[in-house]
């Protein structure tokens, strides 16, 4: 029987939705047979370029390392990595050029293992030239020793190597948790509880979307129809579209030809809004606050979109219409989620990635029920076997922790975000992106299962 061997891989991306590409690469490697995969924090660093490289190649990278176990040989592993890189659209003709994903074998086997072939050299020949890689390896296996005959670093631990080759000032531009992506919220309404009309004007909304992306959101959620409990009238299609269309037009102009970009999500329960949006912008997500209607599911299938199903007991939410008090809210949401996923699978959606489950914090739940639902993330992931998103940002349930205004609940939001991250949540929908992103990165420094 083939033995399982330690492996350390590096991942880099500087094209497209960099965070999403790295997460997809993790999934591909697990399918290829790598088990117990654990990723470091993701560091954003400046591109390393050959002299004379085109200026347009100077795009910051997302970098991380992951450790795991494999039965593949180093050469077989490299072949699998190249298959993944090709599937993601990497252009191998551009030496040191931009790429959606780059995967390298850094270390393999026991500490003394070394090999050299036409396709793979272990340890990686440029490892000691990359302080950020040394730092990341040290975060996952600080006492593993580096062995390379003839090297002055032969036999030193990675903890010591990280001290010998420290990160240069300014080398790290930012950091991200590897397992949880952030969806940034843009409310294009005059009646949102948390934003109170700040982004109703199209240019301000588009600028805010760009700012959230710059702060670390890998998904931008645009909503032009408020659905909070204070709403008595949910308006009509034309009113919602009149707010959303100019923002999409501006973003289409500003992000046209961009080398790095977020996914864009539309927060609506109206299929007509999605049909119109697709015609002017390459949206990637439908955020259906009605819980995933059949028409929305068919749109997701037709256009290859991800469908976020947000549970709500009523639209808009009403204080007299909430989950039962006689049964765990987690159990109730699992039952609803299983029913929805079964329906979507019959339609032809791949529920392992295309459907994202959101238990709908504060949508027909009391504050206590909402907090209990956040405790259930691990159960949702294990039983439903689909990605999970939590939208807890500035929600009324946080009033259990103090009577702060909606706009002043970001501290509580971030605290819950870290707890949700530790439970393995896939996505967090938040208003204040930078604070959440930095907190999740700090929480992930010692590594996260992926």
Describe the function of each predicted region:
Residues 2-49:
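N-terminal beta1-alpha1 ligand-phosphate binding loop
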Residues 7, 182, 264, 307, ...:
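Hydrophobic/aromatic residues located in beta-strands of well-ordered beta-sheets
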Residues 38-70, 224-231, 235:
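Short, charge-patterned binding micro-sites
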Residues 162-190, 345, 349, 404, ...:
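N-terminal amphipathic alpha-helix/helix-capping segment at the start of soluble metabolic enzymes
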Residues 192-211, 227-257, 263, 269-271, ...:
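Active-site-adjacent loop and "lid" segments of alpha/beta metabolic enzymes
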Residues 180-184, 211-224:
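N-terminal glycine-rich anion-binding loops that anchor highly charged ligand groups
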Residues 48, 52, 56-62, 75-172:
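Flexible, gly/pro- and Lys/Arg-enriched active-site loops
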Residues 13, 66-72, 107-110:
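Short beta-strand-to-loop capping motifs
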């Amino acid at each position: 029987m083939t033995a399982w061997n330690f492996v350390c891989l590096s991942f880099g991306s500087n094209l497209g939705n960099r965070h999403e590409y790295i997460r997809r690469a993790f999934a591909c490697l697990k399918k290829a047979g790598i088990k117990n995969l654990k990723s470091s924090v993701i560091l954003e660093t400046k591109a390393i370029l050959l002299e004379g490289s085109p200026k347009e190649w100077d795009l910051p990278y997302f970098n991380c390392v992951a450790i795991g176990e494999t039965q593949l040989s180093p050469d077989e592993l490299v072949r699998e990595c190249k298959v993944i890189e090709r599937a993601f659209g990497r252009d191998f003709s551009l030496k040191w050029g931009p790429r959606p994903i780059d995967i390298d074998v850094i270390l393999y086997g026991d500490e003394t293992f070394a090999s050299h072939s036409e396709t793979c050299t272990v340890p990686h020949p440029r490892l000691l030239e990359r302080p950020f890689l040394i730092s990341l390896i040290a975060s996952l296996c600080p006492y593993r020793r580096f062995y390379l005959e003839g090297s002055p670093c032969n036999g030193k631990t990675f903890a010591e190597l990280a001290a010998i080759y420290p990160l240069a000032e300014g080398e790290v531009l930012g950091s991200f948790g590897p397992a949880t992506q952030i969806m940034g919220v843009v409310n294009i309404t005059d009646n949102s509880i948390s934003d109170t009309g700040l982004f109703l004007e199209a240019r301000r909304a588009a600028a805010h979307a760009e700012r959230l992306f710059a702060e670390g959101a890998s998904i931008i959620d645009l909503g032009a129809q408020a659905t909070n409990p204070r709403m008595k009238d949910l308006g009509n299609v034309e009113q919602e579209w009149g707010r959303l269309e100019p923002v999409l037009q501006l973003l289409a102009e500003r992000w046209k030809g961009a080398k790095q970009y977020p996914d864009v999500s539309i927060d609506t329960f109206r299929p007509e809004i999605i049909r119109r949006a697709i015609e002017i912008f390459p949206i990637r997500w439908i955020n259906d606050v009605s819980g995933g209607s059949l028409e929305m599911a068919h749109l997701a299938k037709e256009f290859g979109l991800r469908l976020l199903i947000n549970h709500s007991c009523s639209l808009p939410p009403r204080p007299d219409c909430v989950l039962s008090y006689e049964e765990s809210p987690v159990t109730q949401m699992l039952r609803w989620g299983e029913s929805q996923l079964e329906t979507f699978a019959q339609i032809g959606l791949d529920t392992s990635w295309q459907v994202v489950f959101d238990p709908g914090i504060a949508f027909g739940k009391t504050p206590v029920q909402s907090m209990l639902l956040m405790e259930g993330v691990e159960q949702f992931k294990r039983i439903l076997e689909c990605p999970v998103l939590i939208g807890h940002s500035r929600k009324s349930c946080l009033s259990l922790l103090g009577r702060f205004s909606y706009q002043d609940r970001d501290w509580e939001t971030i605290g819950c975000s870290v707890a949700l991250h530790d439970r393995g949540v896939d996505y967090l929908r938040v208003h204040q992106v930078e604070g959440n992103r930095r907190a999740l990165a700090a929480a992930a420094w010692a590594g996260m299962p992926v």
